[in-house]
């Protein structure tokens, strides 16, 4: 396990707590009325038991033949931690010697209703669908073990880790091997980070395993020959098993490997405690770096507001309204338009009034490029705009030249050597970098902190979605992942890592293997991953209407209302979660529709972490929970080895979730929408989504006239909800720009051609797939976006005054009392 650098994450807002472990005894008694798949005989049933919080532990009863009423009466023991969500999975299988064993049924049971010292007998049934029943007894007993040290934010729990150091000494071995064959020792520790490690005999070798301290597990090992690739000797020769619980921390134990043809092989074992400090920051509040940035930025914003609104006094820090830019996706169109919007804000002296700057998909290309310059908002934006125009107008044939392809290959090979899992998305990253820059850009997300040191720029927030790699479409399972120069993490779990560690390997919140931070282009490929769309998502996009999307959100809301995520002592919902297996054909078809062959894969920094006993009822978790899987800990992201990150626009074309993190509390949002049609659709979807989660969002109710002929700027608010920010929405429309070269300046006949911007025609140059613009097309789109913001100056200033008034009223009472 690697140590944190001095620049690692700050201390956790939640202190460690000691909690006792318990022994759970599960006795599988009998089953009744089992159906069988074999037409010629009854079932040959057995039961598999797994506990979501005991990784690597799987128990199996004996198989009973030809019976629909098996009686096992077998007991199994788990060591459990009561502060985590312990869900027992019981599965009855019908053994088949020819084909794969058939599953009869499966039940998930939350054991929180098992009271200490009281025997509980449960009968699990499949009614009303079937008559199958399974009788099981549960007994919870206290152990004499010392309490376990936990770190938790009440959603995620980091448990205590131990390290097992294994030294293989085979230098004195006189191994008898035929035909120069080599003997290899394989060591397995189920549930550990490493799982399996191997070494050839003949040299001294050292291994280290990281495993959960409160885990009833064992180290197993075998010798095998390299030539035959099979186990050496019979089933017992060269095989060893070492239970880890009896090992004394800090005490070395030496043992011989029982291999008749390799005498003298010894293992030296030593268990040690792992450092308690986490590399993953657990907490829903803003990190210390962002809080310090906010204090610095408010000084800049206060000065800008005083000048823009012509105030006669300086603002106090608690009076400064928080303004955010919320940019949508749209490929090169979004990139170009965003430059125009920012240019207009700079001309109006309003860019320094902005504190947060969020984006997704194509808008992140603008953001990533600008933040390569620590002083970008203080410099003339015409420079970056010329740069973007030059590269967007150039031919893209060079991007696929033999020389470039060879350079891509070398870069991908280097990434693989560094430990990054390489996918097609990484190739897309290099192609995108070549398109937008024409050269290798040695910039990283952590380097953008230089642009925040004095509060001289807004804080950039990049959004992505984590989805299931297979079997579920984006609408049914998605988790927001936020990237900032300070941290990368999940809004839903309250778990974050510094950007330097994104892509590194973690286990139970500890850094296991540090991998170099990726260059910014590889993150841009994640944020704008146009290749991650699975077939079911594509089918939905092709066949759905806006109304069906609304219905989807409403259905999800009703589902949450009918089946709340908060669990009672009876755990009735989990008890009823009978998972019926589909046919092989159905599963194959589902996999075909939902597979993501071109998704991006990143090591999961949540790997090994567990869910708190009351995670479902935590406000911050339930805010972002929206699927049945959220009540099944074994199906959530901490159980996955890798993240599957995709473009957030595949769900809603919005970057709004970042605006609702606790501690940010925006007063005014400038919404820049880059859709070519339906200028209010994404915003209305966002309102539905936010309201379903209890997030304060203004009412988005454009008039029929505005729907038919949208203006440059629309104001939305909700007087009934003071917590909801004011929202100024800027759709991508060509309204008065057709006739005006600047606000209030009518175009001359010679200038009318410059006002013709084709946004909807059959020859529109701004389609999502187009990455090459003519210079005049780039210029028209840029000037249109610039104009639309400048002509809305009055609306922006009035919204700023209203936001300032609200903040000032909130700030006055505490001062008045002093």
UniProtKB/Swiss-Prot annotation:
Its main location: cytoplasm. Pfam families: C2, cPLA2_C2, PLA2_B. Keywords: Calcium, Cytoplasm, Hydrolase, Lipid degradation, Lipid metabolism, Membrane, Metal-binding. SUPFAM superfamilies: C2 domain (Calcium/lipid-binding domain, CaLB), FabD/lysophospholipase-like. It comes from the Eukaryota. Ca(2+) 1 binds at residues 38, 44, 94, 96. It is a peripheral membrane protein. Its EC number is 3.1.1.4. Residues 273-818 form the PLA2c domain. Stimulated by cytosolic Ca(2+). PROSITE patterns: C2, PLA2C. Calcium-dependent phospholipase A2 that selectively hydrolyzes glycerophospholipids in the sn-2 position. Has a preference for linoleic acid at the sn-2 position. The N-terminal C2 domain mediates the association with lipid membranes upon calcium binding. An additional second C2 domain may stand in between the C2 domain and the PLA2c domain. This is Cytosolic phospholipase A2 delta. It comes from Homo sapiens (Human).
């Amino acid at each position: 396990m690697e140590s944190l650098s001095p620049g690692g994450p700050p201390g956790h807002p939640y202190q460690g707590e000691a909690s006792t472990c318990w022994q759970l005894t599960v006795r599988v008694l009998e089953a009744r009325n089992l159906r069988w798949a074999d037409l010629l005989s009854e079932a040959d049933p057995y039961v598999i038991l797994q506990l979501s919080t005991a990784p690597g532990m799987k128990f199996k009863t004996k198989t009973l033949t030809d019976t629909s009423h098996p009686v096992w009466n077998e007991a199994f023991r788990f060591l459990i931690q009561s502060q985590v969500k312990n869900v027992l999975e019981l599965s009855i299988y019908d053994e088949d010697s020819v084909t794969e064993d058939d599953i009869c049924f499966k039940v998930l049971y939350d054991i929180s209703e098992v009271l200490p010292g009281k025997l509980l007998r449960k009968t699990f049934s499949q009614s009303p669908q079937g008559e199958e029943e399974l009788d099981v007894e549960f007994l919870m007993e206290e152990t004499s073990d010392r309490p376990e040290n936990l770190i938790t934010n009440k959603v995620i729990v980091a448990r205590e880790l131990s390290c097992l150091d294994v030294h293989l000494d085979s230098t004195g071995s006189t191994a008898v091997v035929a035909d120069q064959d080599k003997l290899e020792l394989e060591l397995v520790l189920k549930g550990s980070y490493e799982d399996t490690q191997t070494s050839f005999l003949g040299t001294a070798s050292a291994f280290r395993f990281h495993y959960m301290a409160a885990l009833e597990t064992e180290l197993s090992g075998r010798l095998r020959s390299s030539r035959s690739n099979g186990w050496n000797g019979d089933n017992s020769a060269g095989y060893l098993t070492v239970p880890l619980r009896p090992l004394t921390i800090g005490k070395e134990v030496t043992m011989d490997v029982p291999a008749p043809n390799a005498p003298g092989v010894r293992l030296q074992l030593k268990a040690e405690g792992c450092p308690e400090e986490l590399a993953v920051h657990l907490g829903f509040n803003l990190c210390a770096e962002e809080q310090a940035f906010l204090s610095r930025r408010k000084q800049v914003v206060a000065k800008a507001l005083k000048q823009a609104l012509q105030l006669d006094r300086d603002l106090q820090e608690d009076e400064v309204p928080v303004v955010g830019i919320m940019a949508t996706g749209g490929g090169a169109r979004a990139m170009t338009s965003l430059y125009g919007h920012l240019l207009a804000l700079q001309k109006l002296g309003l860019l320094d009034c902005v504190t947060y700057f969020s984006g997704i998909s194509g808008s992140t290309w603008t953001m990533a490029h600008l933040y390569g310059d620590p002083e970008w908002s203080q410099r003339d934006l015409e420079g970056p705009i010329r740069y973007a125009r030059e590269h967007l107008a150039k031919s893209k044939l060079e991007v696929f030249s033999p020389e470039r392809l060879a350079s891509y290959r070398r870069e991908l090979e280097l990434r693989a050597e560094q430990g990054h899992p390489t996918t097609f998305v990484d190739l897309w990253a290099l192609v995108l970098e070549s398109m937008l820059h024409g050269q290798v850009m040695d910039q990283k997300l952590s380097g953008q902190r230089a642009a925040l040191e004095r509060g001289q720029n807004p804080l950039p927030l990049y959004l992505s979605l984590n989805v299931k790699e297979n079997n579920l479409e984006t609408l049914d399972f998605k988790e927001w992942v936020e990237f900032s120069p300070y941290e990368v993490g999940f809004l839903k779990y309250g778990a974050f890592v510094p950007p330097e560690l994104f892509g590194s390997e973690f286990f139970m919140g500890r850094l296991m293997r540090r991998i170099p931070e990726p260059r910014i282009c590889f993150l841009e490929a994640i944020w704008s991953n146009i290749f991650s769309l699975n077939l079911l998502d594509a089918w939905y996009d092709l066949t759905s209407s806006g109304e069906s999307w609304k219905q989807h959100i409403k259905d999800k809301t009703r589902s949450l209302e009918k089946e709340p995520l908060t669990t009672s002592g009876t755990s009735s919902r989990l008890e009823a979660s009978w998972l019926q297996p589909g046919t092989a054909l159905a599963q194959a078809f589902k996999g075909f529709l939902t597979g993501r062959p071109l998704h991006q894969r990143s090591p999961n920094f949540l790997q090994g972490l567990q869910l708190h006993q009351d995670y479902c009822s935590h406000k911050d978790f339930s805010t972002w929970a929206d699927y049945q899987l959220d009540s099944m800990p074994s199906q959530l992201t901490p159980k996955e080895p890798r993240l599957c990150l995709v473009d957030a626009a595949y769900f809603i074309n919005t970057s709004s979730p970042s605006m609702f993190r606790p501690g940010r509390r925006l007063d005014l949002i400038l919404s820049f929408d880059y859709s070519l049609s339906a200028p209010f659709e994404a915003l209305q979807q966002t309102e539905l989504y936010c309201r379903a989660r209890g997030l304060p969002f203004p009412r988005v109710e454009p008039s029929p006239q505005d729907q038919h002929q949208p203006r440059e700027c629309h104001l939305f608010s909700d007087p009934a909800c003071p917590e909801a920010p004011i929202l100024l929405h800027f759709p991508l429309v060509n309204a008065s720009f057709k006739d005006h070269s600047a606000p209030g300046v009518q175009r001359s006949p010679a200038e009318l051609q410059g006002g013709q911007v084709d946004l909807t025609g059959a020859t529109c140059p701004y389609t999502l797939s187009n990455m090459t613009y003519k210079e005049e097309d780039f210029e028209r789109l840029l000037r249109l976006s610039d104009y639309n913001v400048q002509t809305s100056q009055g609306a922006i200033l009035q919204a700023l005054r209203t936001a300032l008034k609200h903040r000032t009223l909130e700030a006055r009472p505490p001062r008045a009392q002093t």
